[in-house]
């Protein structure tokens, strides 16, 4: 394969991976918005018509689910970033795994990375704990003080 042709393939592959990264980041952003909106509605508007303790309990469960989903999307974004880095470093040398968009293909990760990022570690990052931790803490506080 010629150098120009190989560069064109790499550019297209990078564009595809960047699209996946952007989609995961957008999904994470949307999840945060939905989580905050739903919990705010549940805690602010509905206690007059429903049992407040039940709503606080539901808020904790819903927030935990959104927290997990957000961590999942951030983990996937991280995996696509590993793939992006591998393509930049290796595509000029080889056609192996050309257009492979499977983020779990460990052969397309940097040799420094041995294991897939753990979703629980992603959940306790400094970007997610303040958002979801504060919502859960407030919901639990209301649950035990109402």
Please tell me what each predicted stretch does:
Residues 55-108:
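Inner-leaflet juxtamembrane helices
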